[in-house]
UniProtKB/Swiss-Prot annotation:
The chain crosses the membrane at residues 9-29, 79-99. It is found in: Cell inner membrane. This is Large-conductance mechanosensitive channel. It is a multi-pass membrane protein.
Length: 148
């Protein structure tokens, strides 16, 4: 088998395709969460704290000198990223929890024994008939007090 055909067999397996779709959706979801945190959650939170814009929160380690930009410790952006992570982690946790609950319900569901096929039913009937035919005859008992 050539490397190309092996790769093709690997790439079209259901799990790999599902994983790729999950990664793409996850990346899009990450952008949505980042926008939600940066544009919806942080502005009101900054307003409650006293009109603070979290994206501007930083400690200047070295001011800008000439064409060299300032060296900043941007802890406000870090706070936003931590909040992003918490929201994404919570969403993933809830998804995994729902999937695990569904798996437990599937495991609890009683599985009915498979119905026998027509061939199996017919073979069972033949077996039962053969057993009946091959039964030894019941022993005949003669009562000596009874006339024949």
């Amino acid at each position: 088998m050539s490397v190309l055909s092996e790769f093709k067999a690997f790439a079209v397996k259901g799990n790999v395709v599902d994983m790729a779709v999950g990664i793409i959706i996850g990346a899009a979801f990450g952008k949505i969460v980042s926008s939600f945190v940066g544009d919806v959650i942080m502005p009101p939170l900054g307003l409650l704290i006293g009109g603070v814009d979290f994206s501007d929160l930083a400690i200047t380690l070295r001011p800008a000198q000439g064409t060299a930009p300032a060296v900043l410790l941007a802890y406000g952006k870090f706070i936003q990223t931590v909040i992003d992570f918490i929201i994404v982690a919570f969403a993933i946790f809830m998804g995994v929890k729902a999937i695990n609950r569904l798996k437990r319900e599937e495991a609890k569901a009683p599985t009915l024994p498979p119905t026998p096929s027509k061939q199996e039913v017919l073979l069972s009937e033949i077996r039962d008939l053969l057993k009946e035919q091959n039964k030894p005859a019941a022993p005949v008992t003669v009562d000596p007090t009874r006339p024949l």
